[in-house]
């Protein structure tokens, strides 16, 4: 089994502190999730470390359910979601990028399957997930811009 990693990043036109706040607030986060995400529920907490969420992601014709626990290894910069039922871990990294903007990276890793199924997973899953994350980052940028003018 090989580790599979998917990463996408984008400059978001809002200060890093504000963007990190949108990401860590599980009540706000669904406002910029793309349609591939569904059935988003907050089971406990709701803001940052200790929050537990449940949602589904449809990619490549498959729908998977995730049960995520949130922690903040670097509060204000890195938020991590760990699936309680698999090896999947997603990190959101937010860094200042100058002129009131920020660079946001979404990175997910998991242990891929072995055999022929693992070959297809390693080949197709990263492409599908990267497209979903690029859409999420675009939506995050639009949401952040909207909040800056509100």
PLM features per residue range, with description:
Residues 1-44, 139-142, 150:
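Hydrophobic ligand-binding cavity/cleft-lining segments
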Residues 7-11, 65-67, 89-91, 107:
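Well-ordered beta-strand positions in beta-sheet-rich domains
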Residues 12-14, 59-61, 74, 110-114:
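Beta-strand elements of well-folded, non-transmembrane domains
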Residues 40-89, 103, 135-150:
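Glycine-rich portal/gate segments that line the openings of hydrophobic small-molecule binding cavities
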């Amino acid at each position: 089994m090989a580790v599979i990693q998917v990463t996408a990043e984008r400059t978001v036109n809002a200060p890093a502190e504000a963007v990190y706040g949108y990401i860590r607030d599980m009540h706000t986060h669904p406002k910029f999730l793309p349609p591939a995400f569904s059935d988003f529920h907050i089971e406990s907490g709701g803001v940052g470390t200790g929050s537990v969420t449940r949602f589904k992601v449809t990619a490549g014709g498959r729908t998977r359910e995730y049960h995520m626990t949130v922690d903040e290894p670097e509060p204000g910069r890195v938020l991590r979601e760990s699936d309680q039922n698999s090896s999947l871990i997603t990190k959101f990294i937010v860094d200042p990028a100058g002129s009131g903007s920020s660079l946001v990276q979404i990175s997910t890793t998991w242990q891929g399957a072995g055999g022929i199924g693992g070959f297809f997973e390693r080949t197709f899953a990263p492409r599908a997930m990267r497209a979903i994350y690029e859409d999420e980052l675009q939506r995050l940028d639009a949401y952040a811009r909207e909040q800056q003018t509100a």
